[in-house]
Amino acid sequence: MKAARFVMRSARSLSSAGLVPREVEHFSRYSPSPLSMKQLLDFGSENACERTSSAFLRQELPVRLANILKEIDILPDRLVNTSSVQLVKSWYIQSLMELVEFHERSPDDQKVLSDFVDTLITVRNRHHNVVPTMAQGIIEYKDSCTVDPVTNQNLQYFLDRFYMNRISTRMLMNQHILIFSDSQTGNPSHIGSIDPNCNVAAVVQDAFECSRMLCDQYYLTSPELKLTQVNGKFPGEPIHIVYVPSHLHHMLFELFKNAMRATVEHQENEPSLTPVEVTVVLGKEDLTIKISDRGGGVPLRITDRLFSYMYSTAPTPVMDNSRNAPLAGFGYGLPISRLYAKYFQGDLHLYSLSGYGTDAIIYLKALSSESVEKLPVFNKSAFKHYQMSIEADDWCIPSKEPKNLAKEKVAV
């Protein structure tokens, strides 16, 4: 316990002083090792070896943490020095230092393996509020100065990589904890957090019902679901893939919330609401899920902003002293959902018809061998990206905001 408190104090003092432990420098020289869904399944198979998994994670997790810590350090000083970002940085340093301690302990000792699981649980819990805390840091930074286009571009680049890094480390920790922890809390049909036979329609239905419950509570009404399945590989059979149901649920829940809100608000004077239509198609390479609504759509000029961390129409949430800030209000739903899709080489796109509705499409890999982690690595290319400037546009482009015609002078 004393050692843990010492590590925590050391991490915070190093972070606040702008210093980087030599362990961060050491592990940042290595590139992360992406795993495929198939490899993750093999790690958790019936013949799974806890020692092998532990040996991999005690090396891989510090590498992933160190790589993203190096990127935090090249962000604007005013952002890095905010209390929120300093707190996140101290969490990452503390977690890295705790994991590195296991390099000095025997991997053949069962007590060490048990302690490693406990440490992973501690790290996972410590990082629980990383997303809202970093988001609060961005808000503090935006409130303190004007964010120029170059910085805005760099922050979008960084946050995509930072949150993808978090998704990946959380995935690895959850797999090991669920498979090797003494407390069996996972689904018995799953391997860790992965369902080898994920029923896509069932996840769609569950995410829809969760969203519908919120919609009913807020609007006292909600649209129905119209679900269509097309199995191009095995016609007529239900669609199953190897995937992480919680990741898919996260994406669908966010998209359904948006679709329902738009539908109810756009059709508030209609006698009935048009259903949200979902089409699930399994092809040879991809699983595609299309969510279509008749919620009026959004203008083209706004579509790109929907995936921006720096743009949100929601009121800014207030964090309490315990740092327990809600995600709602940060406007991170869509960009984080797209990262979940991209994590295993998929994607998420929005196609909107202003005045009619929106199609949201999730693309996932159909084969587990092709579902490979998409991981950020801190190298010369990444460093150069933060040094790039935006060249002057060589096209004459009008303002992206619509003109207020009431203020325009009428030409005589």
Curated annotation (Swiss-Prot):
Keywords, sorted A to Z: ATP-binding, Hibernation, Kinase, Mitochondrion, Nucleotide-binding, Transferase, Transit peptide
Family annotation (CDD domains): HATPase_PDK-like
Expression induction or repression: Up-regulated in white adipose tissue during hibernation.
Cellular component annotations (GO), alphabetically ordered: mitochondrial matrix
InterPro entries associated with the record: AK/P_DHK_N_sf (IPR036784), BCDHK/PDK_N (IPR018955), BCKD/PDK (IPR039028), HATPase_C_sf (IPR036890), His_kinase_dom (IPR005467)
Protein name: [Pyruvate dehydrogenase (acetyl-transferring)] kinase isozyme 4, mitochondrial
Binding site for ATP: 254-261, 293, 312-313, 329-334
Similarity-based family: Belongs to the PDK/BCKDK protein kinase family.
Compartment(s) of residence: Mitochondrion matrix
Catalytic activity: L-seryl-[pyruvate dehydrogenase E1 alpha subunit] + ATP = O-phospho-L-seryl-[pyruvate dehydrogenase E1 alpha subunit] + ADP + H(+)
A GO molecular function held by the record: ATP binding
EC number: 2.7.11.2
Tissue specificity comment: Detected in heart, white adipose tissue and muscle.
PANTHER family, alphabetized: [PYRUVATE DEHYDROGENASE (ACETYL-TRANSFERRING)] KINASE ISOZYME 4, MITOCHONDRIAL, PYRUVATE DEHYDROGENASE KINASE
Gene Ontology terms describing biological process: cellular response to fatty acid; cellular response to starvation; hibernation; insulin receptor signaling pathway; reactive oxygen species metabolic process; regulation of acetyl-CoA biosynthetic process from pyruvate; regulation of fatty acid biosynthetic process; regulation of glucose metabolic process
Pfam family, one: HATPase_c
Subunit field text: Homodimer. Interacts with the pyruvate dehydrogenase complex subunit DLAT, and is part of the multimeric pyruvate dehydrogenase complex that contains multiple copies of pyruvate dehydrogenase (E1), dihydrolipoamide acetyltransferase (DLAT, E2) and lipoamide dehydrogenase (DLD, E3).
Positions of the record's site feature: Interaction with the other subunit in the homodimer: Y157, R161, W395
Function: Kinase that plays a key role in regulation of glucose and fatty acid metabolism and homeostasis via phosphorylation of the pyruvate dehydrogenase subunits PDHA1 and PDHA2. This inhibits pyruvate dehydrogenase activity, and thereby regulates metabolite flux through the tricarboxylic acid cycle, down-regulates aerobic respiration and inhibits the formation of acetyl-coenzyme A from pyruvate. Inhibition of pyruvate dehydrogenase decreases glucose utilization and increases fat metabolism in response to prolonged fasting and starvation.
Domain of life of the organism encoding this protein: Eukaryota
Histidine kinase domain segment(s): 138-368
